[in-house]
């Protein structure tokens, strides 16, 4: 048999005429299983009037378990890398030995090591291609390759070496990167890691978007700290990995306000629905989430979902209002009005304080004009926002603005300092617009601003009948509210400008004012009126 093989090898390079000596039976016996003569012609093989590439011939020979002697010749016809790759695929150690004997100085072929499924062949192949003379370097190279190409048996075999040389963490990182699930589990449970960072596997799973890695991390026999799981859940929300989030939620059952808040901020309605269906979040947590949704300009569907979960009697927290204003989210206002406790008045007040013109303008569609102007001007006065005050007063009817400010002053009766500021705004506006003096006199008398009242009277035309009638009304106001100084000043001013005929009517008014004072039991006012009547009776009689 050997002589026949030798003869075949001698004639395998012969010309077609001489190669005809290789009969069909002989070729079959040698293990080639081809018909006709075999002739090598550069990069192809001529066989029975058919042309085959050298690679296909070698591949076919290996697949058919051809005789090693023939294969030794065929491997010379192809490049070494291809020959090695085919030998690895077919788990032919003898062919590898043959190739390495031909190529004593081989380049690095680490990239084809994974083609074999045999652990023994993998190690044997690595023995030849790793040229380092240092034992540790060779071992680390082998273990790196075993991790890279998923050969757990090699790692288990060298477990003590991995522990002794502290290379477990490096290899573990490779296993995570390559998504070798079984290897990852082995690294964590085999005790080969120096310091296992709980976040490594989770971070790798998120970075690669690999759900199977996340499952491995969850199923490992490790007790993870809550802060890590919360952090991973936040990452899942940010990346919108619903499957990842659901796995973490169902596996660890961790519910925190920050989770629902993040889901609302990033507009993750599917995740929000999953969280809300658990019925573990109270109204305050949902309101905080609503505030975050407004901050993140979430969709109307997300806002409606959160609003629908709120108790109708739950008071809207300030952060909701501040989020609308700070992040200028106008679109959410109509939706928030579904909440019974949502107050546009509060929103406008905060918007004025924050000088947010857009929000104030948006509220025009939902509030009556009187209410809106009352709120805006009131807050502009309180915050001394001259710019906003001017913006809302310069184009409006002056008397309408005057009446509005008058109402604001009346509402501030218990806030003396703020009321004084409002009075100053009113006087300044009155001066700029050159309005009639009478309404101003009435307001100053109503709120007992004696000094400003005297100044207004000094500027008024006291001979004007309207001014006279206004001062008489101020008498009644003063007697009703026990403003003795206002009464005394009005009394004296009127006596100076009234005619004899008018003084009689004036006396009747003073008598009526006394009756008002008696009705309200203002003893000081009664004594004052009596003394004034007694003192100036002669003027009335004349």
From Swiss-Prot:
InterPro entries: MGF_505. Keywords: Early protein. Induction: Expressed in the early phase of the viral replicative cycle. The keyword Iron-sulfur does not apply. The keyword DNA repair does not apply. Plays a role in virus cell tropism, and may be required for efficient virus replication in macrophages. Belongs to the asfivirus MGF 505 family. This is Protein MGF 505-11L. It comes from African swine fever virus (strain Badajoz 1971 Vero-adapted). The lineage of its organism: Viruses, Varidnaviria, Bamfordvirae, Nucleocytoviricota, Pokkesviricetes.
